[in-house]
Design a protein with these regions (language model features):
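Inter-lobe coupling/hinge segments of SF2-like helicase ATPases
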Residues: 1-182, 195, 242
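C-terminal or mid-to-C-terminal helical accessory/interaction module adjacent to the motor/catalytic core
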Residues: 178-265
């Protein structure tokens, strides 16, 4: 038996659970005194970012500033030094030497750094209750599950947390990116992971089962027939007859659009 724990199952895994191949249980009870993260989708505005970071700084907290590309981090550092000189930023990304990265993370843990400027390497494994503000640069470039995981880095204490998903002020977003941001903004209550995963499956498709990239048996037999075969196999395994051959109950009908009778002229 294998127990898998996830905040947002990927579409293919979720589809396996919904179709009965895997069992699914939801943990919907939030920790005591946990507050939902307030989420805002906004065009990039230096004034908004300054106010958000200063509010967190003056209440004794810390902030994350996440960019999708390493190339943007140094520019972000210069922007913060010029726009919010009251806070002390530090940079972290996956191409740094291990010792340098460890030093930066240790400084952030010890509250010697106010703002951690990083890529999405911080999306999992961090539990810093004093970090309760998140700024996402170019949030339209992140996937829905990534957005949700990154938002989960804040609000891990008893204080209200705030997430700002910034987009280019002079660029129109494509429909998919706009939909992702709208979904995350609307699902700002606690325990929304399953709802986020369901929306993610709806946007991206469910992998080889229902997505655009179908292959193998699914493509050959079609979605409807494959689902029927899958349901039959699952039912048979649940009944304890996992090794038996699945009976061939299919009666194919062939329609060629022409008469197959012997013509009278031939007789």
């Amino acid at each position: 038996h294998v127990l898998t724990l996830t905040a947002t199952p990927i579409p293919r895994t979720l589809q396996l659970a919904l179709s009965g191949v895997r069992d699914l249980s939801l943990i919907a009870t939030a920790p005591i005194d946990r507050l939902a993260v307030r989420t805002f989708v906004t065009p990039f505005d230096p004034l908004v970012i300054r106010e958000a970071l200063l509010r967190e700084h003056y209440r004794g907290g810390q902030s994350f500033y996440v960019s999708p590309r390493i190339a943007d981090l140094r520019e972000t550092m210069e922007f913060l030094k010029a726009t919010v000189p009251e806070v002390k930023p530090a940079m972290a990304h996956g191409q740094m030497a291990a010792t340098a990265l460890e030093d930066v993370m240790t400084a952030f843990y010890d509250k010697r750094v106010d703002v951690l400027v990083s890529t999405n390497i911080v999306e999992s494994g961090l539990d810093i209750p004093t970090a309760n503000t998140l700024i996402m640069n170019r949030a339209d470039m992140f996937g829905l599950s990534q957005l949700y995981q990154l938002r989960g880095r804040i609000g891990r204490g008893k204080q209200r947390a705030y997430a700002y998903l910034t987009t280019p002020a002079d660029k129109k977003l494509n429909d998919t990116a706009e939909r992702r941001l709208q979904v995350l903004q609307s699902l700002d209550q606690l325990g929304a992971g399953f709802a986020v995963a369901s929306h993610d499956m709806d946007i991206r498709g469910a992998g080889n089962l229902l997505g655009e990239e179908q292959s193998g048996h699914v493509k050959e037999v079609g979605i409807e027939l494959y689902q029927e075969m899958l349901e039959e196999a699952v039912a048979q395994m649940r009944a304890g007859d996992a090794t038996a051959e699945i009976a061939d109950q299919w009666s194919p009908q062939i329609n060629i659009g022409a008469s197959v009778m012997i013509p009278e002229s031939y007789v």
